[in-house]
Amino acid sequence: MTARMEQRFADVAAEGRPVLVTYFMGGDPDFDTSLAIMKALQQAGADIIELGVPFSDPMADGPAIQLAGQRALKAGQTLAKTLELARRFRADDQRTPIVLMGYYNPIYIYGVERFLTDALEAGVDGMIVVDLPPEMDDELCIPALAKGISFIRLATPTTDDRRLPKVLENTSGFVYYVSMTGITGSALPDTSLIAGAVARIKAHTSLPVCVGFGVKTADHARAIGATADGVVVGTAIVNQIASSLTEEGRATEATVPGVEALVRGLAAGVRAARLAAAE
């Protein structure tokens, strides 16, 4: 785990609450608006920012995030420009961890060693690469860890106790528990099952466990946050961005304020989780 991410989890744990992890697609709807969104996420209460890297074949993404990726690609977003987003944000914020989330193909084309060097220089703290299983750790995970960049793994309800140790073997930063099977932005999670799932994962690791997929409201964030170390919100933010755009997919005056308002509500939810868990 990077020092910045470790410090963030420690600081938030000292407050007695879960972290709020927010995802959006880098370059959606354009570079400058994305940078403003990153800053708004932090100002609204996001503890960790997941920065999506657009890809032309996003097999694990739901319709909303697929469309966001298409808008970003149309606007000219690339992996290099996504790293530049991180670099620009990091110039003004040295504390908020940044996690890149995407697919291996753009990294492979960019060049693994070059990518890791540039990501570290840009202030990236971790990555989630959804199409690289543990059996391919030598491709990117092990080199990333050697550079000091966390490699965050996904676990799902179908990750059984035989598979879980392999998934967690080289995981760093935190474990991202997908609270349902399927694609991102699916139906709401069954919060009654989440506590048991988090406990099962924690029996195998000391890493924080963050739960996502299906979190849309402050109430969802509060309910999940009462049993997890963190709450991940993505599709709701992407949908908020999309709803504010013109028919041509351009940003409006409502784009950034709309995201900030949504995330302020979600942040209030995770802070209320501390109170709910203590009752």
Curated annotation (Swiss-Prot):
Active site (record annotation): E50, D61
A molecular-function term among this protein's GO annotations: tryptophan synthase activity
Catalyzed reaction equations: (1S,2R)-1-C-(indol-3-yl)glycerol 3-phosphate + L-serine = D-glyceraldehyde 3-phosphate + L-tryptophan + H2O
Gene3D superfamilies: Aldolase class I
GO cellular component: cytosol
Taxonomy, superkingdom: Bacteria
InterPro entries named among the record's database cross-references: Aldolase_TIM, RibuloseP-bd_barrel, Trp_synthase_alpha_AS, Trp_synthase_suA
Keywords recorded for this protein, A-Z: Amino-acid biosynthesis, Aromatic amino acid biosynthesis, Lyase, Tryptophan biosynthesis
Entry function: The alpha subunit is responsible for the aldol cleavage of indoleglycerol phosphate to indole and glyceraldehyde 3-phosphate.
Listed NCBIfam families: trpA
Name listed for the protein in its UniProt record: Tryptophan synthase alpha chain
Organism: Sinorhizobium medicae (strain WSM419)
Gene field: trpA
